[in-house]
Amino acid sequence: MVDAHFMAEMCAGILVAVTDYDRIEGMLTLDVAHGGETSAGMGGRHFVLKEGEIMLRDEKDIICVLCQGADEKTKVKDDTRNVLFYSYAVPGIDGIYLKEGLTVAAETLAQFGGGTIRCIEVFVKGSR
């Protein structure tokens, strides 16, 4: 899975993250920190967010802090069966590049890991 994610980054020129989908609790929200929120980062790191930092959260915890890293809870492990690849972009980056990177990651994993792609979607601010 990590190779699929790195391959997508190299081919599309965007950052792609991967998480264990089954460990996500409820709906996902892309949010901006008020400052002081905490996250249990991968490998035992502890993040204290600054005001304005971009984060992805489920209904219980922060899953990823942009430019700091992902959480331990949803880390891909040997027993992971369902993954979510995701990416962020700043205004001015066309969604086609995100879709290209996510497609490379999903197709690579499906081909070499024997998985199935459920969907590839790009959400733009204000579209939902």
What are these regions (language model features)?
Residues M1-R128:
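RNA/tRNA-interacting regions in translation and RNA-turnover enzymes
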